[in-house]
Amino acid sequence: MKAVQMQMALETHATGVRDSSRDEFIAARLAKSPTGEDRLMESICERDNMLKALQRVESNKGAPGVDRMKTTQLRGYVRRHWDKIKCDLLHGTHKPLPVRRKEIPKEGGGVRLLGIPTVLDRLIQQAMAQILTALWDHTFSEFSYGFRPGRSAQMAIEQARQYVEAGYTYVVDIDLSKFFDRVHHDRLMQRLAMRIQDKRVLKLIRTYLNSGILTGDIIEQVTEGTPQGGPLSPLLANIVLDELDKELEKRGLHFVRYADDVAIYVRTPKAAERVKRSVSRFITDRLKLKVNEEKSEINRPWIGKYLGFRITRFMGRTRTGVHDKSIAHLKRQVRAITSRNRGRSMSTLISELNSLLRGWAGYFSPGLNATLADKLDHWVRRRLRAYLWNQWRLPRTRISNLIARGTTHHWAVMVGNTRKGPWRLSNNGTLCAAWPDQWFTLSCGLVCLLSFC
């Protein structure tokens, strides 16, 4: 197993190196060629770039756009219509369709509004993002970590931990209110025009920004914002907020930014208040964005949450931990999967739980310790015992299943006829002996969080 995991890690690393080298090559070629930047659309339409974009869109899957075309249909469509698609792009006549509005519930309440482009527009945006990332990424701040090649939320948290370890123990969390919906189009286009000379690319980006949103049967015209859901949106967001990064660097502030999540670390409460006021003013006046004053706050790293983590200091050591709210969110997801009235087989439940737990542990591995992992492992298995018990509604079924697992007839009858609820019984000694924690791992294949520590 370890050999397979190591091979996968090596393959992923090798792929990342190849992609990074290719991007650096493209950036160098465009920078050195006197006509490179005004022929950017030709680079976007190159076969290798388009094939890479197609593979990315297919692997990401995702919901259809307004034309209802699925990602599984995209390759055949592009093969049949590529000559026209390429001609429209090179002549600046491609007309994107409106994005489809989709609401995603937020963890803290409310909804996040997504704009789902058609799969063809996703392909074109992905091809553009690959070339523009090569052109822009090397200019971004080293303290920007979101949606960038070779960077991650875990790296952002490690940088934050280093700040706290160095004595910057007050954090200013700046919350940008509905950032993706309020990006100023003219300011964004001005920023893009500083590095992009190809008017066709600029025109296409402007067309995407103004393509509209289909809500029900009505197309809403938009004059600001870059809808979340398209491959180009994260890069455009980084281009907008790079101006904030440069301002914070110029002031000598210690910060990390992941997409629109900005955290600034200072030494004193007085400095925190001053920084919060001045940075909020810059965001409002210069970037034409809105700061959510209610959610923007000054806190201690071990109290506040950043990207789902918290940073603690104990006995002279600074550590990264999983925030309580992130643990609570995981438990809500597990409860939804193991809800008593779902009527799913144990193998189906295990498959769903494994997908959830692997993703969660992979993300939170920097803050996951053995004590927390062991507690969560036990809690998940207790949920499964309660689920099993609830499926056997008749006492005789419960008794026969207990006996089949080696329980004596006396205790099988005692427990099988009890009126105690499934959750209370799930920690009962008889049930724990019949279906111990390790049974779910060894016999059912349930992921063990402790293995990630």
Segments predicted by a language model, with ranges:
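A conserved non-catalytic segment of reverse transcriptases
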Residues: 210, 284-352, 356-359
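Conserved polymerase palm-domain catalytic core
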Residues: 88-103, 107, 131, 139-305
